Amino acid sequence: MMLPPKYDHRAVEANRYEWWLKGKFFEATSDETKKPFTIVIPPPNVTGKLHLGHAWDTTLQDIITRMKRMQGYDVLWLPGMDHAGIATQAKVEEKLRNEGKTRYDLGREKFVEETWKWKEEYAGHIRSQWAKLGLGLDYTRERFTLDEGLSKAVREVFVSLYKKGLIYRGEYIINWDPVTKTALSDIEVVYKDVQGALYHMRYPLADGSGYIEVATTRPETMLGDTAVAVHPEDERYKHLIGKTVILPIVGREIPIIGDEYVDMSFGSGAVKITPAHDPNDFEIGNRHHLPRILVMNEDGTMNDNALQYKGLDRFECRKQIVKDLQEQGVLFKIEEHMHSVGHSERSGAVVEPYLSTQWFVKMKPLAEAAIEQQKTEGKVNFVPERFEKTYLHWMENIRDWCISRQLWWGHRIPAWYHKETGEVYVDHEPPADIENWEQDQDVLDTWFSSALWPFSTMGWPDKTSADYNRYYPTDVLVTGYDIIFFWVSRMIFQALEFTGKRPFKDVLIHGLVRDAQGRKMSKSLGNGVDPMDVIDQYGADSLRYFLATGSSPGQDLRFSTEKVEATWNFVNKIWNASRFALMNMEGFTYEDIDLHGEKSVADHWILTRLNETIETVTKLADKYEFGEVGRVLYNFIWDDLCDWYIEMAKLPLYGDDEQAKKTTRSVLAYVLDQTMRLLHPFMPFVTEEIWQQLPHEGESITVASWPQVRPELSNHEAAETMRLLVDIIRAVRNIRAEVNTPLSKPITLYIKAKDEHVKATLETNRAYIERFCNPSELVIDTTIPTVEKAMTAVVTGAELSLPLEGLINIEEEVKRLEKELQKLDQEVERVQKKLSNEGFLAKAPAHVVEEERKKERDYIEKREAVRARLAQLKQ
């Protein structure tokens, strides 16, 4: 039983994961005597490396599943990956471009083959990163959103929704990327503030009686205008509703319509309506049966409807049309305008709201069922609860979901068109006379298949599947608040529609990982952090513990190397404490552990504190309060176990009483064993390493039972005594620090006990006071002599007096403190002068002002302490 002198995370973490996998500790057992507990991993995209957000998300899941496994559940944590349509296709196309090829050179079939090769390579990278993090995944059940089982589920859902009239093909305004030439989901659109312009134009009334003013940021779209809208209650324009204007350049007559969507107070109160190029205009167009005129091609160039501008790029057209409108006197004002413009996350192109024929899911009926579910006992519990409002707000304001994508990589839409009649055929399998039909070229939005993830991974649509019947619905989903709408909501309504059950009981929401300044991590800022680099430098246990305990549910997490380093120091502390314990357990076995012997006050206290810690940690973990769990474990391990109990245990361990030695070893072995178990879900590698060296039974800590409170081991009276001893020792240490006296220098110490009971208690535990206070003379009584020139302290149940005569040069100390007081007076004056300066308060950033206020508080506090010390010395 021995640990190396220095903690080396690389040595500790090497080969351990393979050992766990070999032992099959992470595999679900289907053991009917155990209650099942299920989490499905949010499948990462097979596009490359996992980032810190993934590391955080999966660490939280690993903590939950490791804890449940130890609590005796049959745990299934199902791994898998997402084919990530556009993201993966973009990567493979980039690879081909570097080779001087395009996907069209390969053709669809060969391109898809190339993408599968990419998937195999990057899936391997992801698995190796999961291994580095120590994730307890059941790889025997790993799934991929494009594997055969999931493809079957996707076809089943598409066909079923189509036959119910909930999937339809129609025209709609979608986010269009003119570079990749595909529709984008909202999450693939990144909004950036752009300095543009607002172009003010006058459209002449057809009857020659005047004009109406409109403004736009996209003048090139005016070629597709089919109306001008005003608010029906707007007194300025009421009389114009029903009249027409002449569309400049085009010469088309378009109506003036009344619609309540128009904001009377914005701009002129009149709005040009282009139903084919704006989602709000599209809705207005539908209400007023306006024609939809598309003026662009899929590549962002102008089409035939753009007349003389045909063939121009949209931005070139903008320049030309502005020039022409100015010459005609139509465009009368251009003002600078900062506005938010959508860009494609993949290509960087400005996204075009674009009228397109696409496949859609009719969302209202599905959303209504999900909203109703939240009013029942079988609702999905959001943690923190406030995110339920976010979810319901989205569901109540939902629009139909565009599910088709103009890509080659993904689930091909199971729809065929008859080559002659144009008839549409939708089914699980192609039509029998396939030669007369052509399949839809599009694939489904990636979110369509990932929305089925909780049940498609369990064998659905085969409702007799053993896994589906045992492990579905799942228990917890862990995910970020940024995809509540894109993913969480879709999983809920699809699960309710197809399984009649909620897909998970709880949704644990975390925030985003930000840098130390609170900025979002991004390529442009260059502030991204690779979790594998952190693991290499500090180990997986340090990174995991920091990620898990660094914030509370729903909050963002600020990443800081200093904090990871502090955690690494904590792991070192645990290592050194365990090493000390093991050095004193030579030949001590699991069978030797005996907690029935006569225990010291320190033994009773640490066992009581252990019980309290087990109870608190278990309760907090059940509520997903991992930040609080971290604080409780840190305080127990660092303060109670390492700084106090182990130091006190040295008395019997180095003494001659063999029975006391055996009891101390037993307590130390038991407490360390239980502590490793509590810590294991957070720090799996180091706890397994230490636990294997400790006296133990069982093959691995991963399957050891979760600690239980043992009331018979608690002794609250002893715990109170220990608190008194700790208070006394701390008070003496503080006095020594104040008067600059090292522990090696003996002192005289008088302790006045408040009553005979306290006196007797302190006498019984005199050895601890002598060991940790180093008094040359120790007097414990209910009355003590009054000593001039003494440092005093009051603790609950006792008063301490430490004579200074012979300990320090009082005259010198008074001089030193007076000098220090003078300096502190100057600092207080300086900082208060600064804080009373109106100019400073107005101009300085808030954090700088707060820093100065903190300095003021600190200086005043120090000054009071110095004054008190001087008063004591001068008495």
From Swiss-Prot:
Species the sequence originates in: Anoxybacillus flavithermus (strain DSM 21510 / WK1)
EC class name: ligase
Keyword set, alphabetical order: Aminoacyl-tRNA synthetase, ATP-binding, Coiled coil, Cytoplasm, Ligase, Nucleotide-binding, Protein biosynthesis
Subunit structure: Monomer.
Domain of life: Bacteria
Gene behind the chain: valS
Function field: Catalyzes the attachment of valine to tRNA(Val). As ValRS can inadvertently accommodate and process structurally similar amino acids such as threonine, to avoid such errors, it has a 'posttransfer' editing activity that hydrolyzes mischarged Thr-tRNA(Val) in a tRNA-dependent manner.
Family annotation (PROSITE patterns): AA_TRNA_LIGASE_I
Positions of short motif 'KMSKS' region: 520-524
Main location: cytoplasm
PANTHER family referenced in this protein's UniProt entry, alphabetically: VALINE--TRNA LIGASE, CHLOROPLASTIC_MITOCHONDRIAL 2, VALYL-TRNA SYNTHETASES
UniProt family annotation: Belongs to the class-I aminoacyl-tRNA synthetase family. ValS type 1 subfamily.
Residue span of motif 'HIGH' region: 44-54
InterPro entries attached to this UniProt entry: aa-tRNA-synth_I_CS, aa-tRNA-synth_Ia, Anticodon_Ia_Val, M/V/L/I-tRNA-synth_anticd-bd, Rossmann-like_a/b/a_fold, tRNA-bd_arm, tRNAsynth_Ia_anticodon-bd, Val-tRNA_synth_C_sf
Pfam families noted in UniProt: Anticodon_1, tRNA-synt_1, Val_tRNA-synt_C
Recorded domain comment: ValRS has two distinct active sites: one for aminoacylation and one for editing. The misactivated threonine is translocated from the active site to the editing site.
Example of a GO cellular component annotation carried by this entry: cytosol
Cellular compartment(s): Cytoplasm
Signal peptide limits: none
CDD domains recorded: Anticodon_Ia_Val, ValRS_core
Binding site for ATP: K523
MF-aspect GO terms: aminoacyl-tRNA deacylase activity; ATP binding; valine-tRNA ligase activity
Keyword Nuclease found: no
EC code(s) of this entry: 6.1.1.9
Reaction(s) this enzyme catalyzes, per UniProt: tRNA(Val) + L-valine + ATP = L-valyl-tRNA(Val) + AMP + diphosphate
Gene Ontology terms describing biological process: valyl-tRNA aminoacylation
Protein name as catalogued: Valine--tRNA ligase
Coiled-coil stretches: 804-875
